[in-house]
Amino acid sequence: AAAAPTLMEELNISTQQYSYIIAAYSAAYTVMQPVAGYVLDVLGTKIGYAMFAVLWAVFCGATALAGSWGGLAIARGAVGAAEAAMIPAGLKASSEWFPAKERSIAVGYFNVGSSIGAMIAPPLVVWAIVMHSWQMAFIISGALSFIWAMAWLIFYKHPRDQKHLTDEERDYIINGQEAQHQVSTAKKMSVGQILRNRQFWGIALPRFLAEPAWGTFNAWIPLFMFKVYGFN
């Protein structure tokens, strides 16, 4: 969104075409979230999270190759598909590393990290555009994601495999989790069971109502401020 004014000017993209680019990202993100969650369960948090982060890095960097709104829509759709794993993976890591009674504060800190990233990214993107080009903004973002993915692969370990934990710390984490998290062979819920679960709808419905506002602000506010109020 921070790059939208520059992209629209240099690639001659209309507001309607920009909306298609946003829709491509949002649709891919939405469809891929349950798929990404399944992949994370199959591959595990460490490998699954790293795989999606590398894909995000590749697709983000490849956005620099786009020469039209159609190319941008394809690239951003691919980014959305890879990014769909980030919140499920973060929550899964939180569930692995914190007992149930401390899960809320763990997720709170996870959200703080997401917010800090969202705060840092726009100035970084604008700096790259002003100092270099809009293509460089996507290349830098992709490179940083790749570095992070490598660091994740090196440093992240499940509590069972983390040698720096004492036995007491490890037992505190694992024994404080729900029963299904204590054994790797626990039976997973089916899609039907999830959809019949009232707790699922208690989470899903507020998100369904909140996401349109968040998505609109995130995608359109920078462009609105640029066109209506003349922000640079």
Residue ranges of predicted features:
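Cytoplasmic helix-loop-helix junction between adjacent transmembrane helices
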Residues: 75-114
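Helix-loop-helix hairpin linking two adjacent transmembrane segments in secondary transporters
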Residues: 110-163
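Extracytoplasmic gate region of multi-pass secondary transporters
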Residues: 197-232
